[in-house]
UniProtKB/Swiss-Prot annotation:
Keyword GTP-binding in annotation: no
Molecular function GO labels: large ribosomal subunit rRNA binding; structural constituent of ribosome
Gene transcribed to yield this protein: rplK
GO cellular component: cytosolic large ribosomal subunit
Organism (species): Amoebophilus asiaticus (strain 5a2)
Protein's recorded name: Large ribosomal subunit protein uL11
Role summary: Forms part of the ribosomal stalk which helps the ribosome interact with GTP-bound translation factors.
Length: 141
């Protein structure tokens, strides 16, 4: 018989850098999960993605065990990395903070395809382009 699921938990943690300190510790501790076990497993599975922000979906079972799925880095983080900026614009329609090419947008869209709600690369590219524009990043040919 399958384990009974009692809840889900979403976190964003830097790859290879999960520690029992906030935000990981309090979030897992409040659900009664083994914090160190999660940190060890997460760090082992994300050694190759050191320093990248990674969304994690944790499935919590009734016997206080867990499974987790690591998603691809957020589109905004990928855009900031490709555009070479530290943060987006607070007034994206007035202040442009960086420039990114369409080829970089397509590359980000292709890497995020599994997490986006589309099966069409063109639609995914438009989603990523919209994120870039809302951050104040100009897209050039």
């Amino acid at each position: 018989m399958a384990k009974e699921i009692v809840g889900y938990l979403k976190l964003q943690v830097k790859g290879g850098e999960a520690k029992p300190a906030p935000p990981v510790g309090p979030a897992l501790g409040s659900k009664g999960l083994n914090i160190m076990e999660f940190c060890k497993q997460f760090n082992a599975r994300t050694q190759d993605k050191q320093g990248q922000i990674l969304p994690v979906l944790i499935t919590i079972y009734q016997d206080k065990t867990f499974d987790f799925v690591i998603k691809t880095p957020p589109a905004a983080a990928s855009i900031m990395q490709k555009a070479g900026i530290s943060k987006g614009s607070s007034e994206s329609n007035r202040n442009k903070v960086g420039v990114i090419t369409w080829s970089a947008i397509k590359e980000i869209a292709a890497s995020k395809m599994e997490d986006l709600n589309t099966i069409n690369l063109e639609s995914a590219t438009k989603m990523i382009a919209g994120t870039a524009r809302s951050m104040g990043v100009t897209i050039k040919e």
